[in-house]
Structures are given as structure tokens and as C-alpha cells.
UniProtKB/Swiss-Prot annotation:
Protein purpose: Catalyzes the dephosphorylation of undecaprenyl diphosphate (UPP). Confers resistance to bacitracin.
Compartments reported by the entry: Cell inner membrane
A single BP term in Gene Ontology: regulation of cell shape
Keywords: Antibiotic resistance, Cell inner membrane, Cell membrane, Cell shape, Cell wall biogenesis/degradation, Hydrolase, Membrane, Peptidoglycan synthesis, Transmembrane, Transmembrane helix
GO CC list: plasma membrane
UniProt organism field: Agrobacterium fabrum (strain C58 / ATCC 33970)
Family: Belongs to the UppP family.
Database matches in PANTHER family: UNDECAPRENYL-DIPHOSPHATASE (PTHR30622:SF3)
The protein's name in its UniProt record: Undecaprenyl-diphosphatase 1
Amino acid sequence: MGDQSIISALLLGIIEGLTEFIPVSSTAHVLLAGHFLGFKSPGNTFAVLIQLGAILAILLVYFQKLVSIAVAMPTSAKARRFVLAVLVAFLPAAVIGALAHDFIKTVLFETPMLICVVLIIGGFILLAVDRMPLKPKYTDIMDYPPSLAFKIGLFQCLAMIPGTSRSGATIVGALLMGTDKRSAAEFSFFLAMPTMLGAFVLDLYKNRDALSFDDSALIAVGFVAAFVSGLFVVRSLLDFVSRRGFAPFAWWRIVIGALGLVALLVIG
């Protein structure tokens, strides 16, 4: 294990944390960065465990709100409806993810060119939706009905295609269904909790025979980097979106996708 491997692990962890909760596709960024850095994950352990760092970041930021919702559930119909809405939104991705896991991981994830193209297409879609004169009917995530949440959950299934972005798909779906930008991003945070935990557990189970902690230092570096950078994003994203919208992320996707295509054609 050399200094170059540690630097690569640090960069990939930072990329995971910074991109996991914004609509630019963390999967695309981590896969493309790993490809061009020539980083070889120890088994599949590194890729699986750095996700846990990002998961813990969002759980920490929203810990008090999660506790308050849990405490209110026995007496508050609003709290119970919100929990139901999150679970209903999670269901489509849970079913499709479990059924198509092997195909997604072994076929779609091995196609960098596809990832770049999807990044660009998704960027233009996000840009178009961000500029639409939408009139939001829902501005508080606690008021999202389960029927709305289910539709958002269907959009989340699009994120099975690498480069789409889980948060991007849910945010676009929420905006088209009548939410405002801030609450769309916040609901995406809450939906990320069961979705990412479920994906983590499934990945861990599927890769149980390949897991290796031989390079535990690399895993630790990536994990901590993902956790710290994830904290920064979760704490600042809602205010950023309220001020700037999603256009900066859309242009970022387009630029990174285009640069990735050029690099793949030139370098391979």
C-alpha cells in the first residue's frame, strides 16, 4: 500500500461524501474517478464501506429530528403519515433493486461511456425542470401524502442506471409532482436513509465472500473522508438550493459527462 493508494482512497471518499446527496450521481463520480486513478478496490469492501460513511453523516445531522418524529408517532397522525410516506417511497426501489441487483452491478456499472452519456442527459433534464415555472402545492415534507411519496419513489428507480443520481431522480420527480425545491431536497434526504441502508446491506450480503480487510487503512481513510464531506453537504445543501436552485448541479453534470467522454475516447 503506497502513498498513491492512500491519496486515491482519500479522494474517492471525499467524492463519495460530496456527491452522494446532491443531484450529480455519486456512483458516476466514484466509478469514473476510480477508473482514471487506476484505483483497485480491495475486493469490493472499499466501495461498499465508504457508503456507510455518507449514511452515518446524514443520520447524525438528522438525529434529533428522527428522534422527535419517533417520539411523536404514538400521538401524532402527521408523524405516522410522514413515516408511512417515506416507507412507501422506498418500496419501489427496494423491490427492483433486490430483483435486478446482479444485472445492475455487473453490466451497467461496467460501462463508463454509458455513465457519461447519462450524466449529460440527466443534466439537461435537471436544467429544464429547474427553469420550469412550477407552482408548488407542497412546501413541508411533513405534509407529503403517501400517494405523492410513492410517485417520487417510482422516479427513484431511475437511479438504478448509473449516472442518473438517486437524489436527482427523486428531486426531479418531486418538483414535477408539485413540491418546492427546498422540501424536494429535504425529502430526498429522508428517502436516502432507508434506501442507502438497504443498498448497503444488500451489497454487503452479495459481496460477503469477496470482502477483505487486508487494506483496512485505505478503507478507514475513505470512510472518514466520506463521513466528513457528507456532513458538510447535508448541512449546507438546503440553504444553497433555496438560493441558487439546481442549475449549478445540472451544468456540473453536463461538463463532467462531456469531459469524461473525451477522456475515455482519448485515454481509454
